[in-house]
Amino acid sequence: MDLRTMTQSLVTLAEDNMAFFSSQGPGETARRLSNVFAGVREQALGLEPTLGQLLGVAHHFDLDTETPANGYRSLVHTARCCLAHLLHKSRYVASNRKSIFFRASHNLAELEAYLAALTQLRAMAYYAQRLLTINRPGVLFFEGDEGLTADFLQEYVTLHKGCFYGRCLGFQFTPAIRPFLQTLSIGLVSFGEHYKRNETGLSVTASSLFTGGRFAIDPELRGAEFERIIQNLDVHFWKAFWNITEIEVLSSLANMASTTVRVSRLLSLPPEAFEMPLTSDPRLTVTISPPLAHTGPAPVLARLISYDLREGQDSKVLNSLAKSEGPRLELRPRPHQAPRSRALVVHIHGGGFVAQTSKSHEPYLKNWAQELGVPIFSIDYSLAPEAPFPRALEECFFAYCWAVKHCDLLGSTGERICLAGDSAGGNLCITVSLRAAAYGVRVPDGIMAAYPVTTLQSSASPSRLLSLMDPLLPLSVLSKCVSAYSGTEAEDHFDSDQKALGVMGLVQRDTSLFLRDLRLGASSWLNSFLELSGRKPQKTTSPTAESVRPTESMRRSVSEAALAQPEGLLGTDTLKKLTIKDLSNSEPSDSPEMSQSMETLGPSTPSDVNFFLRPGNSQEEAEAKDEVRPMDGVPRVRAAFPEGFHPRRSSQGVLHMPLYTSPIVKNPFMSPLLAPDSMLKTLPPVHLVACALDPMLDDSVMFARRLRDLGQPVTLKVVEDLPHGFLSLAALCRETRQATEFCVQRIRLILTPPAAPLN
């Protein structure tokens, strides 16, 4: 169904439903249903012309006719998904609204949530339209003055995001992946609730399991808490959360479900300089020095994975480099050594430059080792913010050169070498190749970079707008990772009283807090179920109950019990009962209930949860909801909105997001998209695999276009309906398996020697 037909069908159904519920009397539920359909009609009619314009020019930004992908197309596709869901829901309501089994409260909650999402998508479409008018033809990233980019960011971070993390979570992705995203979001908000209080690791995870029940049954609360976390918690929180997969119990479970390999060994490469021959003249050599930046010389860790035990992999030299990881279970009898492979894959993992290791990526790397039949050498580089740029690049380059020189120890002859990585690892694959060319040593025979980030500048692009709704790559989290990697992140110190507790004091404190959380979690579950059933829970007399009262006003969802109340008795969950005026207007409500709920949802005040989003006083926060002050001499982005349209504003009070104007983010070894032509011409064939709904999509499209313009061999494959990081979700569903298989095909293409020319 084309966009215009879909919009017209939705408008017709909305008008029919609006007329029906308007005639149902003065009841609160009927009034809200009528209002929400009026809002759907208004937003759909306002959005359709803008989407049509974006779609009409989107082909100018594609790599070629065979690869129709860029941020403008992705925004239109996302808006169509939202419109399609509203169309489906409107049809359902029209067909079942007279039935005694019609769940008015459930359908109202979904309609209000998706109307809020549609309103925000309309704002994003206007942003994209503004970019379209100020960018050069064919350019996706804004290249103008930094003031306008800062104004974009200032306007952008004030938009409300919670609607995308509640009932609408992951609506743009394939349905098979949405349950995982919901589980991830519940785990995130539960983990964030205990972060900075239980600092000793596993207790945070354990407490989250017992106290996160209310987030599972209350999508609105989950969305509000998700928004608070992504805007206020620092990069150390994200390191801790993303590294949950490093916990031995979880990693063991993941390995049980993955392919069994003969070799999976962690190696420690000594920080000793060695010589490498120059490709221009092998008789000459260049010295490869160990990494020195920030922390001085230190061993570099890497993991060797091989499906078969090959010659050299159990040599005395390699055994001396092996690092103990505890006893490992040998599931199959020790085989005879297979001959060395003719190829080698050097892998660099992702994780935003701040988290994860090869252990997190081991499940899919084992599958690669089996399918490709070659050894895989995965580098564990030092992570930011403790080791900012260029430490990771130095370590990856050092480890790559070591692997090329000592490939016989890794079970390979090194005839063909592929550099492969995802996300931040894809960035490092490209920059390692640039550095190898600069040193004059052997570059890999090809690069496979999955959804890489190719520019770390704070530049607006249509695909970056998707970070407003992306549960894996929110804009503020991207900024925190960039800040950490570039070395501009403020140092975060533990509280002095925590240091004074000592190890035993921390254990005693965490045990006490864990038992308290267990009791409060059980009480929270009971209260939630009692509220959902229409019963009023008894008041607790526990002194610790005071600590959970600020969230009580957010806890109640739109439920049948709440909607069954007589008109005028709105209860305390006004946040869940937003009318269409509330959903489409950023002006503060005059309702005391709304004022109270907005106050309840305000940001946390402790300084230890503020990263680089500077604190502001309450008056500034209130003004920011209605007014975003422009910089001097800079056009206002708000002018992109037509008169009468007001997107929803965030209640979190975020007033600032740093603009990375430091020259370091323009370094070509940090942002290869900004590298001069002479450097990019030294790259080997590059194979990019991107996601159509990834905020990093435009990075891949523009990088491929630059290489294509230079005559460099490059391919770009864009997979549909999958989020950033699909390699780590390879076993989740058919779509992720197919996307992962395509990455394997690209690696296999690189490792295949070119056909000999015919005489």
UniProtKB/Swiss-Prot annotation:
It comes from the Eukaryota. Disruption phenotype: Total acylglycerol levels are unaltered whereas diacylglycerol concentrations are drastically increased in white adipose tissue of knockout mice when compared to wild-type littermates. It is an enzyme of class 3 (hydrolase). Pathway: Glycerolipid metabolism; triacylglycerol degradation. Phosphorylation by AMPK reduces its translocation towards the lipid droplets. Its main location: membrane. The modification Phosphoserine is found at residues 557, 559, 597, 618, 650-651. GO terms for biological process: cellular response to cold; cholesterol metabolic process; diacylglycerol catabolic process; ether lipid metabolic process; lipid catabolic process; long-chain fatty acid catabolic process; termination of RNA polymerase I transcription; transcription initiation at RNA polymerase I promoter. The modification Phosphothreonine is found at residue 574. The keyword ATP-binding does not apply. GO terms for molecular function: all-trans-retinyl-palmitate hydrolase, all-trans-retinol forming activity; diacylglycerol lipase activity; monoacylglycerol lipase activity; protein kinase binding; retinyl-palmitate esterase activity; rRNA primary transcript binding; serine hydrolase activity; sterol ester esterase activity. One of its GO terms (cellular component) is nucleus. A motif (Involved in the stabilization of the negatively charged intermediate by the formation of the oxyanion hole) lies at residues 349-351. Pfam families: Abhydrolase_3, HSL_N. Monomer and homodimer. Interacts with CAVIN1 in the adipocyte cytoplasm. Interacts with PLIN5. Lipase with broad substrate specificity, catalyzing the hydrolysis of triacylglycerols (TAGs), diacylglycerols (DAGs), monoacylglycerols (MAGs), cholesteryl esters and retinyl esters. Shows a preferential hydrolysis of DAGs over TAGs and MAGs and of the fatty acid (FA) esters at the sn-1 and sn-2 positions of the glycerol backbone in TAGs. Preferentially hydrolyzes FA esters at the sn-3 position of the glycerol backbone in DAGs. Belongs to the 'GDXG' lipolytic enzyme family. This is Hormone-sensitive lipase. It comes from Mus musculus.
